[in-house]
């Protein structure tokens, strides 16, 4: 009984509470448009914290749309900006996308958000990331990469992730991780 009443009190999607900016192209690696949807609360005068969402799908299937209900729920019931992000899948671009590429896409989206979220009334200093399945793994990689930013000469024997998006005032950025027995996942 309690569950039924509780679910009646929560509105999963109330578009009157948020603005939706759909399919914003934030980068186009090799002509492949990467998009995100941004949900921003209406009638909020302060900069809101940001939730960035990465979808699952085993790095091979699905797109950001599978998290639309979750994004709508957060936007309808909380004062957060929600960024629902697409990244390239391994099967995209005629199966030429490497695992490092999609991690670079995800990290690039965070850099884009930090540079642009103020336009949507978001606080670039308060960004949280979440994901389901493969998206959760991507979140773990992003958090790990943040500890490995450095100069190229410090990591010459390691593999590099290159973010898909770089802010205009940043001319070079490589993110390094230690070598893996596999540099390509199929």
Task: Name each model feature, range by range.
Residues 126-128:
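Residue in the alpha/beta-hydrolase core beta-strand immediately N-terminal to the catalytic nucleophile
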Residues 47-56:
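Short beta-strand element of the alpha/beta-hydrolase
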Residues 176-183:
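Conserved small/polar residues in nucleotide/adenosyl-binding loops
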Residues 63-64, 70-71, 83-124:
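Catalytic nucleophile-loop/oxyanion-hole region of alpha/beta-hydrolase
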Residues 3-45:
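N-terminal cap/lid segment of alpha/beta-hydrolase-fold proteins
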Residues 148-171:
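Short mixed-charge
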Residues 136-148:
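Short glycine-enriched nucleophile-adjacent loop
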Residues 131, 135:
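Gly/Ala-rich beta-loop-alpha elbow adjacent to hydrolase catalytic centers
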């Amino acid at each position: 009984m309690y569950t039924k009443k509780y679910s009646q009190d929560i509105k999963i999607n109330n578009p009157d509470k948020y603005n939706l900016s759909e399919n914003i192209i934030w980068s186009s690696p090799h002509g492949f448009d990467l998009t995100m949807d941004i949900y921003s609360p209406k009638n909020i005068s302060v900069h809101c914290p940001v939730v960035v969402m990465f979808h699952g799908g085993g790095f091979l299937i699905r797109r950001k749309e599978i998290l639309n209900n979750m994004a709508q729920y957060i936007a309808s019931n909380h004062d957060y900006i929600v960024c629902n992000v697409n990244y390239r899948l391994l099967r995209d671009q005629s199966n030429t996308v490497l695992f490092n590429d999609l991690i670079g896409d995800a990290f690039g989206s965070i850099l884009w958000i930090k540079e642009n979220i103020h336009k949507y009334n978001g606080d670039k200093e308060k960004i949280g990331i979440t994901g389901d399945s493969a998206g959760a793994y991507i979140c773990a990689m992003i958090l790990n990469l943040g500890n490995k930013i450095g100069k190229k000469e410090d990591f010459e024997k390691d593999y590099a992730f290159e973010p898909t998006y770089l802010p205009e005032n940043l001319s070079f950025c490589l993110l390094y991780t230690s070598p893996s027995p596999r540099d390509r996942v199929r």
